[in-house]
């Protein structure tokens, strides 16, 4: 697709960008946050819920859909959009990250990667061409190349080998891609090495993909290292193409990523912490299970106008979580997704008015981020999924 991305404005005092991404299922205003619906659903929400909070782009995961229900079934149903009754934009991850998180359950060679299904133990083999074919059959608007995501503790030689294999696979994915209505994005690797990140960005930029993602970050490393790597890497990617930072979704991280020049974000964080009773607010995350909320008559977030905050007291939400009622998870998820959707709209408006830096400073002056040590501990636990299942 020609002219798939238009850069409308760049901040005069940072690298924050305001743009528009055009796809077969509509226009996306950037910078944008995409909720994750790995298995063709954003957990606990309907498409109508997402639209009600102005979400028009979500992510689904090819690995999970390949194993269950299977790509042929979704194709027979008319593609992923019809299968899940979603007429907005869908970005599909190739599943590379999930496959490589299987560690001892997978083996790779230059041709592709073999792995054992976490569902039934069967052995599967996927090539870069397969990853492209699967995503074309799904009919997503944005597809990702198959990449090798090295472990956060990988040696320099292992990171180099993973980067070089990622480059070769990206080239094969590009050659195999034939669906003109779908954008294929490359994924920059290189660990935390500035030199390897530069090499990866420059090589993939030379292949002229419609967009570029930064993979292999936000895997438990300190946040200052994450964003130092992001800022460095983006210097070597074309300004006229969208930049996608994978796996980032905390409010403070979205602000920092935007200031670096990132256009697209995705993360399971808002939905996952919602199901654990954490509600985003302008002051930081609020734990609804705290006894202080047991008798609070007003909404948990007085500044929020989402369905949850308009209709339910904090005391009621506290009760639902204490009783482990399913409605608790749904109402918390609606709130967290609405919070991030509103935050991204405010970010876009501030870039348009060239006051993003003031907006960011004002937000962070009141917002209390999660303790860094706790965040890293949670991240490491989440990276390995549950019951042997790779992360969503």
Curated annotation (Swiss-Prot):
It comes from Dehalococcoides mccartyi (strain ATCC BAA-2100 / JCM 16839 / KCTC 5957 / BAV1). Its EC number is 2.4.2.29. The active site is at residues 93, 266. Keywords: Glycosyltransferase, Metal-binding, Queuosine biosynthesis, Transferase, tRNA processing, Zinc. GO terms for biological process: queuosine biosynthetic process; tRNA wobble guanine modification; tRNA-guanine transglycosylation. GO terms for molecular function: metal ion binding; tRNA-guanosine(34) queuine transglycosylase activity. It is an enzyme of class 2 (transferase). Residues 247-253, 271-275 are annotated as: RNA binding. This is Queuine tRNA-ribosyltransferase. Homodimer. Within each dimer, one monomer is responsible for RNA recognition and catalysis, while the other monomer binds to the replacement base PreQ1. Its cofactor is Zn(2+). The keyword Metal-binding applies.
């Amino acid at each position: 697709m020609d002219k798939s991305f238009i850069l409308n404005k760049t901040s005069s005092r940072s690298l924050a960008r305001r743009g528009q991404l055009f796809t077969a299922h509509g226009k996306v205003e950037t910078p944008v946050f995409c909720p994750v619906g790995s298995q063709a659903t954003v957990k606990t929400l309907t498409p109508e819920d997402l639209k009600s909070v102005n979400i028009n782009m979500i992510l689904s995961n090819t690995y999970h859909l390949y194993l269950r229900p299977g790509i042929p079934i979704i194709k027979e149903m008319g593609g992923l959009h019809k299968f899940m009754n979603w007429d907005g934009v869908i970005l599909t991850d190739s599943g590379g990250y999930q496959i490589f998180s299987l560690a001892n359950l997978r083996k790779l060679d230059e041709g592709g990667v073999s792995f054992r299904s976490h569902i039934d133990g069967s052995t599967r083999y996927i090539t870069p061409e397969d990853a492209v074919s699967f995503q074309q059959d799904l009919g997503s608007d944005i597809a990702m190349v198959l990449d090798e995501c090295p472990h956060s503790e990988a040696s320099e030689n292992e990171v180099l080998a993973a980067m070089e294999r990622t480059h070769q696979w990206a080239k094969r994915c590009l050659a195999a891609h034939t669906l003109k209505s779908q954008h294929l994005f490359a994924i920059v690797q290189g660990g935390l090495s500035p030199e390897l990140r530069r090499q990866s960005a420059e090589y993939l930029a030379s292949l002229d993909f419609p967009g570029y993602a930064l993979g292999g970050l936000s895997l438990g490393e300190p946040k200052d290292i994450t964003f130092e790597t992001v800022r460095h890497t983006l210097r070597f990617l074309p300004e006229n193409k969208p930049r996608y930072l994978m796996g980032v979704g905390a409010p403070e991280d979205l602000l920092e990523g935007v200031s670096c020049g990132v256009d697209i974000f995705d993360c399971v964080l808002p939905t996952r912490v919602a199901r654990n009773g954490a509600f985003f607010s302008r002051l930081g995350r609020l734990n609804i299970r705290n006894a202080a909320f047991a008798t609070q008559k007003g909404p948990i977030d007085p500044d929020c106008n989402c369905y949850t905050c308009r209709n339910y007291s904090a005391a009621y939400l506290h009760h639902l979580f204490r009783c482990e009622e399913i409605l608790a998870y749904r109402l918390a998820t609606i709130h967290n997704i609405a919070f991030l959707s509103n935050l991204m709209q405010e970010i876009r408006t501030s870039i348009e008015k060239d006051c993003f830096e003031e907006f960011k400073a004002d937000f962070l002056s009141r917002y209390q981020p999660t303790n860094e040590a706790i965040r890293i501990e949670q991240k490491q636990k989440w990276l390995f999924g549950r019951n042997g299942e790779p992360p969503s």
